[in-house]
Amino acid sequence: MIRNPQRRRLLGAAALALPALSMRAALAQDAREALGTLQGKPSGGPHPLQTLMQAHPAALRRELRGVHPRVFTTTAGLDALRKRAHGAERKTWQQALDKLAALRQPPAAAPAQKRRAQNETGIGIAGAALAYRIEGDPKYLDAARRYMDAAVSYPVWGYTFSKPDIDLAAGHLLYGLGMGYDLLYDVLDEAERKRYRDKLVRHATILADHFMPKPGKSYSYSQNHCFIPIAGLAVAAYAVWDDTPDAARWAALARAIFSRVLEVASPDGYFYEGVEYWIFSMPWIIHGLDAFAHAAGDDMYDTPNLRNTHLYIAHSLTPNGQDVFDFGDVFEGPVTRARKGEEPARTHPGGKLNSNYNLLYRLAARFGNAEAQGVADWMASLGHVCAEDFWTLLWRDPALAAAPMSSVAPHRHFDDLGTVYWRSDWTPAATAFAFRAGPPEGHHVTTRIGKLPDWHLETGHAHPDAGSFILYGGGGYLTGPMGYAGIPSSKLSNTLLVDGQGQANEGGGHDAFRGYPYARLDAIRITRAELGRERADIVAELAGAYRPELGVDTLQRRFSYAAGTWTVTDQLRAARPVVLTAQVHGDQDIAAAGAHGFVVEGRAASLRVEAAAAARAVIEPGVVVAAGPPGHVDQGPTEERGTVLRLSLPAAREARLVTTLSLQRRRA
């Protein structure tokens, strides 16, 4: 038995070498990743983005030129919002005012290199500026000015040591300072306007020059380091449209990149970077699209991904409403679920998930989608937190009736990403699971990537976890992955190893799929998903996940559920004798229970595991290379998170392993 494995421990020399600025979710990359842009060999003809920029310039509407505010709303729009804020929406608006960051704490002082410090400054400006225009109280104006002055004081927008002035913080500050400049234009004196305008123009110029198309340049369109900075650029472009002729070029660039971002998104609504990155990055899709829709009259919303994404986040929540089905780089696995360490203050303030659910109100309003409205209301009822509560006033349509969660199917197969979610119902007492078997960015990439020479993949936040599952029951999380990793590995998920080796090109850095043929990944697929009210039966083909030199000819995993028991049947055929290993992870202790049985302890319930007689069992700590600082995310400390049971069959060319996992509820 392994005692108290959910605690996080730093192991070996890597722990002693942990950089002072180690930032798990400073949302970093390793030196081999090209998040945003990549300069390759030039090819003939104009760059595709140049063609898009000319075809869709996204110019500021003529009636908005020379007036402020204009980016997200107008003076007339503010009047209507003020009536709602002081009328039917008073309670919601007051809650947003109570949470304004700019009223609760001072902005980070320059150079503001602590993780997320500059992000918070940008968001703080936006909230305080809107609050002043609704309330007229000088305290909000004073707060906005403090935060805007802080943004101006930062010599570098972002980290001085990793992508300065062109990355996430630059996007946040262009958005915040641009929104503040636009909303407060009429109450700022000329010296203030010039100071803020000059800073906006300077940093928008730097960022736009970096992202401007050049022969051979490609973009990680599907990755958040691309579209978050560009969303900020769009806001800044419309805010200073009258002040610099370059703003038109910035807007056209931002619109062109966003058109690609939407084009490459999975049509089933799934976000391949995982739930944590959906929470962090999806608001920026909304901010960018809202800027184009309002300022340019260019509505780009109507895409399959955005019509379906409310179902992704709904199904990603475990029945307790506060944890998630955490495929990929999501939180810290057992540590976060135990609400230990520093991260829960950010991920679960006050014990409630920071989910940014209010962005669903915007999608519900845009599509007239009662189901999306209902999902947002449900998440609100769970006490979820939003980074920008103040947007609810603009995003939520109070006239749109919300569909109850009982009307949403409790199971869904996201067929592009190859992920199935199932639950017995939408109550906290439900039994639930998720099963994943698909390529990291979805099957649609196979036909799309060759047609878009300006798109390159950066899949570091996806894990080599094909065939893995997450189980929930008896009021608690039963088994699942180990969380965010600097070096993702199949050993961190409930999937299979072949001769002790995991999937794709794991072990070579943060992106386990770098250099691995996507056509081979596309062969990973769910071939059957029969989902019913009381049972489920899923079959997946996994051979494509493993490197050819491992000799796997076929590898099939069948995953079935009925009456509180999951049955996993793995069948392998290989070119030479290999050892097949199945894995089951636990947040707490795993102990032997009989000749071939094991118990995975949980906080609310436990999981009984029964293995084939021939399987050799090993129970050991779960070991993770955690994330390092930006630019070196693959050089983080080695940590223990939870425990893992590994069941291995003797080496053979053909192997069949059957494992049953049964929910054991606590006795009252």
PLM regions: where:
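C-terminal segment of N-terminal export signals and the immediately downstream linker at the start
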Residues: 3, 24-59
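N-terminal export signals
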Residues: 9-28
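Membrane-interacting alpha-helical segments
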Residues: 38-49, 92-111
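Hydrophobic alpha-helical membrane-insertion signals
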Residues: 50-52, 59-99
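Short secondary-structure junctions and interdomain/linker hinges
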Residues: 67, 71, 88, 92, ...
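Aromatic-lined, polymer-binding surfaces characteristic
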Residues: 75-78, 106-320
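Extended polysaccharide-engagement surfaces of secreted carbohydrate-active enzymes
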Residues: 277, 282-668
